[in-house]
Amino acid sequence: MTSSLRHELGPARITAATPLLLLPVFSLALAGCGAAPMEEPTAVTLTAGPSGVVRGGQQPIGGALVQLMAPGITGYGSAPSVLATTSTSTDGAGSFTLPGYTCPTPDRLVYLQISGGNPGSGTNSAVGEAALLGNCSTLSSTTHVVVNELTTVAAAYALAPFASVTSGGTAIGTSSTNVTGLNNAFYPANNLVSYTLGVATPTTALSGMVLPTYMVNTLGNILAACVNSTGPASTTCAPLISNTTVSGVAPIDTFQAALNMALHPGTNVPGLFGLASTSPPFAPAITSLTPPADFTLAIGYNGYTISNEGGYALGIDAKGDAWVTANAPNTGGLGALMEITPSGQYSAASGYQTPTYGVVSFTGMAIDPGGVIWVASNSDSLQPTTTDAMIGFNPNGSVFNQFPVTFPLGVAVDGSGDIWSSNWTNMYSSFQELQDQSGTYTNNAVTVTTTESSGGAVCIGPMSRDVWEVAAGYNQGSAVTLYNTTALTKTTITPDSGGSYITGCAVDHAGNVWLADGTSFNGVEVYSNTGALLHSYAIAGQNTATGQFNLLQDLALDGLGNAFVSIFVYDQSGNGAATYPGRLVELNSSGAVVSPAYGYQPTSGAPNTGGSGLQALTSNLLTSPGGIGIDGSGNVWLTGVDYYATSAASFVTEVLGLAAPVVTPHSVAVKNNAIANRP
């Protein structure tokens, strides 16, 4: 998976700030992705635990079971540890105080799980709520939390990739080698709600982010209709249960229902949307009579150069930080490499740049097993001092190494740390291997020449055996070149569709390549490493009558082999076409589209505010998406830019809890034969 070929970006406004945490600051003891967890020498014992209240909407819930839980670390969906147990008061306050407890080793992030209780209409066995607290040993008797449907929504979307939902209960757990991924999942959820107040964070309260406040409140109102009822058979609870039943397994409470909504946000949306009360407990919420396209929860990052320039390529490092290349505006400025942490904090205000070659047009990027971020940079006539180059950045933003490379586009790194870059000339494209010699990268290795005029994405198969280059020839037609690094042979594949706009690729665990084909076929094709067409999956959405054209950009495979495809919806000028949001389509490992037919369309849910451009008239958080990546928490990241906006409207988008976690960076998955596997 690499970034796809994109157009140049226009100028817009820049915003900047560092978001604040709403929970107590986490003091994390994190394991490296793909490494054994860090062990603590002794357990930590607290004499008194946190306190708080449990509510259904704004009503206290009395007699509810309150459990302090530590996620399991023996496998995904493994049994959590119950650290402390109590019940809420029945005096009309719904309050609780946890007794003392001993933190597990290694010290972990913990959460509250609520079951049953009386919200005012009698005992309701369908009550299930949750709240993420933070690091076990940093909690104390002064920690106070409000648990309600909003904290439940945030917890469900964070924990869904690690959850097992059965008729016997809910289990949250990860593997011993992905404690980092589970810990990181707490951070974006922490930005969605205030756990001390039990309210959703306002849409623009955290600078550099646009939060899905209206969507969080809408989901909370749907759950509250069941919580504040007489039980599972009630007219507002039974439909929630039936509409969130997955594979014949019905949820036993509202927490399980929320987990299922997080994992299947495009399922039964109209039926669920209509469950909220006409006088709902949480506002502001979506008030339109028309339900949203789906119930994805996403955060739009628009700080610093992102809002102005948009994003192009994207990669996730071992810590779970997202690295994004931002192009320069058409003013002769310099582009930048941006870093976004799981908590939403940014790197330096202007991003990371290099003084030697300059950075104008970033195209591709990839992260090597040692954590160096390699970026393809192209020169520009507006910056005559810049030169085409491959630039390696250390995680602190300093330059590790840099050297000239002619018009580099796609970038991938294999398991040994060698860089593979596609290159574009006027007559042909090529891709080459830039070797790692004891940490010093030199420009002196394999070059494979192809016949197409536009190089594109580069993808590497398991154990670095195969390297794929996608050449998007536009009107000349596309071709895919396979280079076997063992036999040193080259094979050219002409897509079965005859497509002329194939820009993205990803390789699965079996070594098959998945191609994003945005031509008239409009779908995904899968080829074996012998060049045989295995599958072709069409994606709905082309509408030539209205001028709506799907341009599939890139795709990524999650830890269960599901494919996520980013789609830029092209609004052909002059034909009266409406405003179209960007799209994210999900296919399962068998190729069936499991997202809505037109894909997920993440939104903040806020009312339209006017403006110009494809996205500015809407509250969409997915702006003409391009590059795509999945992190160790199961979040899907996309770069994007609003090409036609007259004010800043571009985002890097994080869709929460939608995918299965993957090994990061991708080069480590290649090295360890863990592509499309969970860590």
Task: Write out the residue ranges for each language-model feature.
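Residue-level signal for mature regions of secreted extracellular proteins and peptides
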Residues: F26-S27, E129
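Feature for extracytoplasmic/surface-facing segments of secreted or surface-associated proteins
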Residues: G34-Y312
